[in-house]
Regions:
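Multi-pass membrane proteins that catalyze or facilitate reactions on polyprenyl-/lipid-phosphate substrates
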Residues: 1-269
Length: 269
């Protein structure tokens, strides 16, 4: 599968824009690939390369929270006093949330690969639209200490189910946290920290895949850089929209993409 630099950049931009905006990156990658005539299914290394770019974007955007969670975790292992600090709590919430994601993600991998086609994606995008439309604007829990482990578990289960292409991972986890009463500033932070763990796992699992794919370095680097740059800008936009209570703004867009895809598939038959 030879990939041009332009194709790599387009896929990187699509991933960067859609990973953090609540519109489903996996769904958009499937549709971009289909409508641009690059074949129905995407090679897995595309997911891995673009995912590495967005992983770096979150690391840099949320570096204070990442540093707080990592140092808090290691300090908490040796000191009872450190276990009363927000960093320790944040690390535990992210770890608790990551367990169901990993179990569901690995368990459903076969199912997920079968749903990697335009029709199931169109249906899932419409569902994501409803999730965003009915999500609360904010909740009372604005300190890490007020978020419960059950909140983290719920977000982790939702994140695991979001491996279905067309279901937005960021959209559904942020909506789940808002529904559990988490505040509009903290919900996206927790969502993106949960994403970091999963994304890191995907990157590790995918090293062999990239080696085996026999793809030139140029497209791989172009894809990663494009998804990083666009992803960073998209993160800023998501936080701004949530602050203004405009999260549902993406629902009509999702319904439109879904309707267009379904109509197109019906015509092409």
């Amino acid at each position: 599968h030879r990939m041009s630099i332009l194709q790599a950049i387009v896929l990187g931009v699509v991933q960067g824009l859609t990973e953090f905006l609540p519109v489903s990156s996996s769904g958009h990658l499937v549709l971009a690939n289909y409508f641009l005539g690059w074949g129905e299914s995407l090679p897995l290394y595309v997911d891995i390369a673009t995912n590495t770019g967005t992983l770096l974007a979150v690391l840099i955007f949320l570096w204070r929270d990442v540093a707080s969670a990592i140092t808090g975790f290691f300090r908490g292992l040796v000191s009872a006093e450190a276990r009363r600090e927000p960093g320790w709590r944040l690390a535990l919430l992210v770890l608790v949330g990551s367990v169901p994601t990993a179990l569901i993600g690995l368990g459903m991998r076969g199912v997920f690969e079968r749903l990697n086609a335009p029709l199931p994606v169109a249906v899932a995008l419409a569902v994501t639209g409803f999730v965003l439309w009915f999500a609360p604007r904010s909740g009372p829990k604005h300190a890490v200490g007020s978020v419960t482990f059950l909140d983290a578990l719920v977000a982790g289960v939702v994140q695991g189910l979001a491996v279905v292409p067309g279901v937005s991972r960021s959209g559904s986890t942020i909506a789940a946290l808002l529904a559990r009463g988490v505040d509009k500033e903290l919900a996206p932070k927790l969502s993106f920290l949960l994403y970091l763990v999963v994304s890191f796992g995907v990157a590790l699992l995918g090293v062999d895949e990239v080696r085996a794919a026999d793809i030139e370095a140029g497209p791989l680097v172009a894809m990663t850089v494009a998804s990083f740059a666009v992803g960073y800008a998209a993160l800023r936009l998501v936080f701004a929209l949530l602050r203004r209570g405009r999260f549902r703004a993406f629902a009509p867009y999702l319904w439109a993409v879904s309707a267009f895809t379904l109509a197109y598939l019906a015509l092409v038959g």
